C-alpha cells in the first residue's frame, strides 16, 4: 500500500525505491519500465491503490515528458530498442480496464504527447443486451461470489461455462439477475463505467492510443477450464480486430504470479501476442520473458 501511494504522489522517488531508475539507467539506458494505471479522478480518491488524482497525473506525465523517453507502442519492436542507444531512460505507459475516466483525462496525455496502451476487458465493454456482453458479466459475477474464489472443482466451472455458452439471450438475462444477487465480494471493475465498443473504436484511431486485449470478463486466467480460457482469449482478439486494435500486446487480469502459467502463455503466443504484461514490479531487459513482463503501478 505504501509503495502504491508513493507511486501516485512522488513518481521519480518511487522508481528509485523500486530500483527501476538509477543506477541501472545511469550506466545503460537499454532498459525500460512499464507503468500500469487503472482509474483517474478529480474527486476524492476512494481507492488509492488504483485511482490517480488528475493533478497528480499531470505532474507525473510532465516529469516523464521532461526526463524520459516515452515508448510509442505503435512502432515498438524490442529487437530494435535493444540495438539502439537511448540517451534517456525509457518508459511505456499502459492503462488497464478501459475505464471511462481515460476519455476525461486524455487531454493530459495529449498535452505532453505521451503514447499509451489501453488494455480492454472486451466483454465488459459490450452492451449487456448482446450475447457476449451478458456472458461476460455473468462470468465476472461468478467470481464475485466468495465461495467461487476458492478452489472450485474443475467440473463445476466447466459445466457452468457450457451452460452459459448454450443459453438463449432470455435465459442469460434471467441467470444474470440471479447471479448478481448472490455477489458478496464485488470487484471494483464491476462498479466502474467502462468505455463502450463505439468509444473504443473511436479511440483506436487516436495517434497516441493503442487498444489491446485484457481478456473478455477479467478472470484469473489460470483458474478457468481450458475451453473457458480459449474463449477469453480468442473472443477478445476477435473484438480487438473489430476496433482496429493491436493483438501483439496483452495484459493478464490481476497479473500476479499465480495468474500466469505456461498454458496461458502458449495460447497467447498462438493468438499473435508478443508482449504480455503482469503486475509484478520488474524492469524490461533484453533477456526478459516477453510473455511475462513486469509493470510498476
Range-by-range predicted roles:
Residues 35-41, 110-258, 292-293:
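Metal-dependent polysaccharide deacetylase catalytic core of the NodB/CE4 family, i.e.
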Residues 94-95, 212:
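Generic enzyme active-site microenvironment
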Residues 103-110:
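Short alpha-helix within the catalytic core of nucleotide-sugar-dependent glycosyltransferases
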Residues 107, 201, 265-266:
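Alpha-helical segments flanking ligand/cofactor-binding loops in enzyme cores
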Amino acid at each position: 500500500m505504501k509503495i502504491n501511494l508513493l507511486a501516485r504522489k512522488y513518481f521519480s522517488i518511487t522508481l528509485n525505491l523500486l530500483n527501476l531508475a538509477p543506477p541501472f539507467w545511469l550506466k545503460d539506458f537499454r532498459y525500460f519500465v512499464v507503468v500500469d494505471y487503472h482509474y483517474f479522478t478529480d474527486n476524492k480518491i476512494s481507492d488509492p491503490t488504483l485511482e490517480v488524482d488528475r493533478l497528480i497525473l499531470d505532474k507525473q506525465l510532465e516529469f516523464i515528458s521532461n526526463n524520459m523517453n516515452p515508448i510509442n507502442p505503435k512502432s515498438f519492436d524490442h529487437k530494435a530498442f535493444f540495438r539502439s542507444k537511448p540517451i534517456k531512460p525509457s518508459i511505456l505507459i499502459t492503462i488497464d480496464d478501459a475505464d471511462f475516466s481515460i476519455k476525461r483525462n486524455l487531454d493530459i496525455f495529449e498535452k505532453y504527447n505521451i503514447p499509451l496502451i489501453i488494455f480492454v476487458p472486451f466483454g465488459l465493454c459490450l452492451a449487456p443486451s448482446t450475447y457476449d456482453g451478458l456472458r461476460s458479466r455473468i462470468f465476472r459475477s461468478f467470481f464475485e461470489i466468495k465461495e467461487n474464489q476458492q478452489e472450485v472443482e474443475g467440473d463445476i466451472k466447466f459445466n457452468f461455462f457450457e451452460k452459459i455458452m448454450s443459453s438463449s439471450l432470455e435465459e442469460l438475462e434471467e441467470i444474470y439477475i440471479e447471479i448478481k444477487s448472490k455477489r458478496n465480494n464485488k470487484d471494483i471493475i464491476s462498479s466502474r463505467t467502462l468505455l463502450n465498443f463505439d468509444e473504443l473504436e473511436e479511440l483506436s484511431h487516436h495517434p497516441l492510443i493503442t487498444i489491446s486485449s485484457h481478456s473478455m470478463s477479467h478472470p484469473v486466467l489460470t483458474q478457468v477450464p481450458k475451453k473457458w480460457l480459449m474463449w477469453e482469449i480468442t473472443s477478445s482478439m476477435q473484438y480487438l480486430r473489430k476496433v482496429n486494435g493491436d493483438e501483439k500486446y496483452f495484459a493478464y487480469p490481476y497479473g500476479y504470479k499465480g495468474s500466469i502459467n505456461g498454458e496461458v502463455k502458449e495460447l497467447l503466443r498462438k493468438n499473435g501476442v508478443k508482449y504480455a504484461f503482469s503486475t509484478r514490479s520488474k524492469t524490461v531487459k533484453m533477456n526478459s520473458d516477453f510473455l511475462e513482463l513486469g509493470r510498476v503501478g
